[in-house]
C-alpha cells in the first residue's frame, strides 16, 4: 500500500480490526458491529493482505496482537472516538459547541446567572460551561474562551471589551442601617475590605470626610464580603448593581446616597485565540443584554 491512498482507505476493514483488537475476539467484534464472526474475520484478512503484514496472532482460543497491530490500534481508536464525538455535535441539525467562560463570582450570581435561561433557550446547541473566579484568571493557562472580570481593562495580551462600570456604595443590614445617621457613624462599625486597598479612602473622600484608616477583614469577593457583613453586623463597600435583588427585597440596605466608581466589568479573551461561532454568538448576546 503506497502513494496517496486516502480515497482507498478500507474503512470497513479498519473498523473490523479496531473492534476485534479491543475485544481480542472476532465473535465479540461481530456482536458490536452487528455482523457475523466470519464477516469480521474476512475484513481483517483483507486488511492484512492490503497492508502486506499480519495484525493478529491467531491462537487456539482468542487473538493476540502483533507489534504492527499494537501500533495501529491506538491510532484507530483515537480517530474513531474523535469522529464519533464530532458527529454527536451535529445533533438536532446544529453543530453543538462547547463554550467555556470564567466569571468573577459576584458578577455570576448578581447579573449573569439570572439571564442564562434566556441564552440557553435561544442557543440550545451551545454547551455553556461557567467557571467562577475571584478576579485572578490566566486565560492562556486555563484554556477558557472568555473571562468576565472586574477592573480597568488593562490586562495584557487580551482583547478587553467594557460591559459596564460598577459604582460601589455602602451596603449593610437594616439593623445596622438604623444606627447610621451620618457617614462618620461608620467609625463605630466593622468595615469589610477587598483586595483594593484604597477603596474606603475613595468613598470617604466622596462623602467629604477626612479619611481614616480602616481595619477589618479582607475578602477577595464582593459577594462573600456582603454575606459576611450580614452575618456579623458589619458594613460592606460593594457594587450595588450586583445586589439589586437583595436591595429590592430589603435584605440589604444602602444607608447613604454616596457612591464611588472603582472600575467596571469587562469581557476578555486572548488576542491569539481564534473566534469560534459560539464565542461570536455569546459576545453579541452579552453586549445586547448589557444595553437593555
Swiss-Prot record:
Residues 26-45 bind DNA. GO terms for molecular function: DNA-binding transcription factor activity; sequence-specific DNA binding. One of its GO terms (biological process) is DNA-templated transcription. Keywords: Activator, Cytoplasm, DNA-binding, Transcription, Transcription regulation. It is found in: Cytoplasm. GO terms for cellular component: cytoplasm. Residues 9-66 form the HTH lysR-type domain. The keyword Heme does not apply. It comes from the Bacteria. InterPro entries: LysR_subst-bd, Tscrpt_reg_HTH_LysR, WH-like_DNA-bd_sf, WH_DNA-bd_sf. Belongs to the LysR transcriptional regulatory family. This protein is a positive regulator of gene expression of beta-lactamase (AmpC). PANTHER family: HTH-TYPE TRANSCRIPTIONAL ACTIVATOR AMPR, HTH-TYPE TRANSCRIPTIONAL REGULATOR. This is HTH-type transcriptional activator AmpR. It comes from Providencia stuartii. The lineage of its organism: Bacteria, Pseudomonadati, Pseudomonadota, Gammaproteobacteria, Enterobacterales.
